[in-house]
């Protein structure tokens, strides 16, 4: 792949009010008449996690690309403290976004938490899912395999409120779970700086998102 670059919404990224009650920030690439690929990001990420260069490659292969901010992420609705939801609710958001756009079905690609969401779409909304790719993710089955203790500890550590300190934490965390074959600290640093400039995720959002994983089980 060519070098990626973090994107900027430039104030022009649309927001859809979904039937699930979420205001969902999304971005489209390519021709909506082409088959759609929905890209679903992971915990602590935003739609910027999918580089424009990657989206451009998919468009070049004849796909319409849809990337969006999950609930409690980026510029989508940040829910009140104490709100509980599940992966099923998050999968329903993705399907409701298709409804909003008048898209009958799509290929779903998810990373980490996004991988769990697309698994749920495939299981609960099979008529809307043409195919599913779940990357760097889990099924919720404790026998399936789990990250190492150091990785789990880093994932569960609360992110600092200070944007610069939060970026440093993310750079260090990514060293734990990114492949050394392609790890690019400069890109990771720029990406997380773009996250914090665009929308700093409140700490309570992490607990709600992680709670969705725990509540959903296997």
Where are these regions (language model features)?
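Short beta-strand immediately N-terminal to the catalytic nucleophile in serine-hydrolase-like folds
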Residues: 108-110, 135
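Gly/Ala-rich beta-loop-alpha elbow adjacent to hydrolase catalytic centers
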Residues: 110, 114, 118
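Conserved acidic catalytic loop of the alpha/beta-hydrolase fold
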Residues: 88-106
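Catalytic nucleophile-loop/oxyanion-hole region of alpha/beta-hydrolase
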Residues: 79-91
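Conserved HGGG/HGGXW glycine-rich cap/lid loop of the alpha/beta-hydrolase fold
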Residues: 18-80
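Alpha/beta-hydrolase
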Residues: 149-218
């Amino acid at each position: 792949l060519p070098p990626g670059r973090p994107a900027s919404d430039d104030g022009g990224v649309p927001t859809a009010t979904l039937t699930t009650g979420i205001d969902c920030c999304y971005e489209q690439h390519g021709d909506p008449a082409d088959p759609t690929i929905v890209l679903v990001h992971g915990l602590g990420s935003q739609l910027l996690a999918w580089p424009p260069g990657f989206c451009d490659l998919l468009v070049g292969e004849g796909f319409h690309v849809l990337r969006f901010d999950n609930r409690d992420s980026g510029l989508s609705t940040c829910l009140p403290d104490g709100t509980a939801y599940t992966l099923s609710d998050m999968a329903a958001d993705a399907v409701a976004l298709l409804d909003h756009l008048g898209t009958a079905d799509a290929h779903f690609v998810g990373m980490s938490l996004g991988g769990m969401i697309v698994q749920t779409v495939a299981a609960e909304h099979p008529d809307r899912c043409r195919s599913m790719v779940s990357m760097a993710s889990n099924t919720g089955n404790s026998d399936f395999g789990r990250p190492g203790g150091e990785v789990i500890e880093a994932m569960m550590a609360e992110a600092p409120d200070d944007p610069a300190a939060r970026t440093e934490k993310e750079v260090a965390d990514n060293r734990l779970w990114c492949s050394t074959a392609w790890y690019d600290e400069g890109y990771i640093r720029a990406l997380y700086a773009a996250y914090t400039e665009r929308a700093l995720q409140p700490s309570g959002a992490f607990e709600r998102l992680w709670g969705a994983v725990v509540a959903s089980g296997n």
